[in-house]
């Protein structure tokens, strides 16, 4: 009916098909636009920027802060700009110029290319300023993490799990044995150890996970040899643990949305319930199961159904309750109009027998 709805751009990209960037008719993507949204994002993170015990977080969260297709992460003064849209990348110079003009204290800039492109752009590169040391040690709630600004798309820590790590440290670590599956660089394990866990066990199929996990313990003054680290398929570890009758007080499960190894293909949408069924027997009586997914195509209600079905399939008579649900922290701003952007779902489940 020819009613104006908003200004948007449409294009092929890693996430989504199109984004509305303004409700103002004829608003241009210019210096004033980007300066405005960056200033608002910066002000909304003032508390984090002033924090002495947290020096890494999401500084600009794409559509949640007014413009989809690009995110900016803060690592103790170094910023990592991730591009999800080739169309948005055409505004690269304008966006970087306004970001550097707005965000105070930037030491160096890195970028990640997360869209398919025909120009063969490197997936990770240093853009300018001062290069970060390797590793760059950042703080999260007082815990140190070794990060790498220019080692592929990942840096060594998933910033969206900050509140989950802190919850595990504060409530589910002291005096407990902790199993961390799909452990990546062992960040959950380090948080648990710093929270007083008597033993942590980290399991990941990637060869790099061993040295990376050892490093995360070491930078916090924890001897890696006092912890257990396995480089093996998580599902094979389940079989090993059941055979050895191993039980853990806290079990953390945070698989990728989709993964393929030589032995199997895993998809959260299809296989998470089976995963829960296999890991439930490893949870000690009155233990805690922490289940996480970043699959945007799985709703919270669907996720809960998968979990409940998996537990019942494994041990139908076992009593349990969901005691806590966590999602994205406030720096990962989510627009009300795009619920799929609110992708992180984490359930804390306590067993009573």
Language-model-derived ranges and their functions:
Residues 185-198:
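Conserved SAM-binding loop of SAM-dependent methyltransferases across substrates and taxa
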Residues 208-252:
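S-adenosyl-L-methionine
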Residues 1-74:
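Non-catalytic accessory regions of SAM-dependent methyltransferases
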Residues 174-184:
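Conserved class I S-adenosyl-L-methionine
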Residues 234-312:
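S-adenosylmethionine
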Residues 60-73, 89-158, 166:
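Non-catalytic substrate-recognition/targeting regions of SAM-dependent transferases
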Residues 199-204:
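Conserved SAM-binding motif I beta-strand of class I
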Residues 288-353:
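C-terminal catalytic and target-recognition region of SAM-dependent MTase-like enzymes
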